[in-house]
From Swiss-Prot:
<keyword id="KW-0472">Membrane</keyword>
<keyword id="KW-0066">ATP synthesis</keyword>
<dbReference type="InterPro" id="IPR000711">
    <property type="entry name" value="ATPase_OSCP/dsu"/>
</dbReference>
<keyword id="KW-0375">Hydrogen ion transport</keyword>
<keyword id="KW-0139">CF(1)</keyword>
<dbReference type="InterPro" id="IPR026015">
    <property type="entry name" value="ATP_synth_OSCP/delta_N_sf"/>
</dbReference>
<comment type="function">
    <text>This protein is part of the stalk that links CF(0) to CF(1). It either transmits conformational changes from CF(0) to CF(1) or is implicated in proton conduction.</text>
</comment>
<dbReference type="GO" id="GO:0046933">
    <property type="term" value="F:proton-transporting ATP synthase activity, rotational mechanism"/>
</dbReference>
<comment type="function">
    <text>F(1)F(0) ATP synthase produces ATP from ADP in the presence of a proton or sodium gradient. F-type ATPases consist of two structural domains, F(1) containing the extramembraneous catalytic core and F(0) containing the membrane proton channel, linked together by a central stalk and a peripheral stalk. During catalysis, ATP synthesis in the catalytic domain of F(1) is coupled via a rotary mechanism of the central stalk subunits to proton translocation.</text>
</comment>
<comment type="similarity">
    <text>Belongs to the ATPase delta chain family.</text>
</comment>
<dbReference type="Pfam" id="PF00213">
    <property type="entry name" value="OSCP"/>
</dbReference>
<keyword id="KW-1003">Cell membrane</keyword>
<protein>
    <recommendedName>
        <fullName>ATP synthase subunit delta</fullName>
    </recommendedName>
</protein>
<dbReference type="GO" id="GO:0045259">
    <property type="term" value="C:proton-transporting ATP synthase complex"/>
</dbReference>
<dbReference type="GO" id="GO:0005886">
    <property type="term" value="C:plasma membrane"/>
</dbReference>
<keyword id="KW-0406">Ion transport</keyword>
<comment type="subunit">
    <text>F-type ATPases have 2 components, F(1) - the catalytic core - and F(0) - the membrane proton channel. F(1) has five subunits: alpha(3), beta(3), gamma(1), delta(1), epsilon(1). F(0) has three main subunits: a(1), b(2) and c(10-14). The alpha and beta chains form an alternating ring which encloses part of the gamma chain. F(1) is attached to F(0) by a central stalk formed by the gamma and epsilon chains, while a peripheral stalk is formed by the delta and b chains.</text>
</comment>
Length: 178
């Protein structure tokens, strides 16, 4: 994506996010954007909307399926995107809107990689530690299993990482022995 395209995406995303905050609908809109993002990931809809061989009418029909989402703000954004024939940028607008919502509210989805799944009590205990160490609020905790860590965990959010894995500790020891 070039600077011109990013500027266009911001032109849609930033006023949308500002309005979402003015109306106090951050949680609801973020959840709906997450659902849209999941649909795009599962179906490859972003490629469909950006394909030059697909008619504007077909692209419009596809985007209209997301209207009546229960969020008037999101429905209005979709309508504006359709009216301005920017369907090909809709997925990027969704991603940028989510990013801006996270950035402004300082609430992030935290990814926690570990060898074994954490119990509910472990998740409850680690949440305040993550918030304190990373200086953010945890919107949700996404767990990923990674047997290559050997033990421990790796926490990632907002371009920050805490690596408390045995794999990393072994790498540090290896570097010191060189």
């Amino acid at each position: 994506m070039d600077k011109k395209q990013y500027a266009i995406i911001e032109k849609y995303a930033l006023p949308f996010v500002q309005t979402v905050f003015e109306k106090g609908q951050q949680e609801d809109v973020f959840e709906k954007l997450s659902q849209i993002k999941a649909v795009f990931a599962e179906t490859g809809l972003a490629d469909f909307l950006s394909h030059i061989g697909i008619s504007d009418h077909e692209k419009e029909k596809s985007l209209r399926l997301f209207q009546n989402s229960g969020s008037q703000l999101l429905d209005n954004l979709i309508e504006i995107v359709i009216l301005n024939h920017r369907e090909d940028l809709f997925y990027e607008i969704v991603l940028e809107s989510q990013h801006q919502l996270e950035k402004i509210s300082n609430e992030f989805e935290v990814t926690l990689r570990s060898v074994q799944p954490l119990t509910a009590s472990q998740k409850e205990k680690i949440r305040p530690i993550i918030e304190q160490k990373m200086g953010l609020k945890v919107r949700s905790l996404k767990e990923e299993l990674d047997s290559s860590l050997i033990g421990g965990f790796v926490i990632s959010a907002n371009n920050k990482t805490i690596d408390a894995s045995i794999k990393r500790q072994l790498q540090v020891i290896k570097e010191k022995l060189k």
